[in-house]
Regions:
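A beta-rich soluble binding module of mature secreted/lumenal proteins
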Residues: 16-174
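Bacterial N-terminal signal peptides
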Residues: 9-16
Length: 174
């Protein structure tokens, strides 16, 4: 009976965890997305202060295609507290069609979080990324800097979507 009760408790929790939306309500992912153009190295320009990235500078994300259609994700940054490089390897999968930039990413087993490209310039040089709620936001660039006009545009988009842009950490690249 105890096992049945545990099983019955686990099912609703599992359904809730795995059926949650990967994008905040009212926000749309980029459409007409080209996965091949997005792959490669990106520099993290700004982010919210997440436990898993705390004290990291020189932060990058590198995306490459896996044979099964998923995307290999390698995040790397220099920990200024320990003076050591830290990296994490995971995988990303499209939630819907590959032309919609709504993905889920995992760095640990079957547990996925939202990864949504919500703004992207036509040349795939700058990207604004939202997680599955308003607590996750990144600004990425193909270089270690971003033009002031792009920064202003992305901050306005994020603020309009409900993100608290005053909480962003601006990543140092040196």
């Amino acid at each position: 009976m105890k096992n049945l009760t545990s099983f019955i408790t686990i099912i609703p929790i599992s359904i809730m965890l795995f059926s949650c939306s990967t994008i905040p309500k009212g926000i749309n992912a980029v459409t007409q997305f080209d996965k091949a153009k997005y792959l490669g190295k990106w520099y993290e320009i700004a982010r919210f202060d997440f436990r898993f990235e705390r004290d990291l500078n020189n932060t990058t994300a590198e995306y490459s295609a896996n044979d099964n259609g998923s995307i290999k994700v390698v995040n790397k940054g220099y920990n200024t507290r320990t003076n050591k490089w830290k990296s994490a390897t995971g995988k990303a999968k499209f939630v819907k069609d590959e032309t919609i930039a709504m993905l889920k990413v995992s760095f640990f087993g079957p547990f996925y979080g939202g990864y949504n490209v919500i703004a992207l310039d036509k040349d795939y040089r700058y990207a604004l990324i939202a997680g599955n709620n308003l607590n996750y936001l990144w600004i990425l660039s193909r270089t270690t800097t971003i033009p002031a006009a792009v920064k202003t545009e992305y901050l306005q988009l994020a603020q309009k979507a409900g993100f608290n842009i005053n909480e962003l950490i601006w990543v140092k690249h040196d």
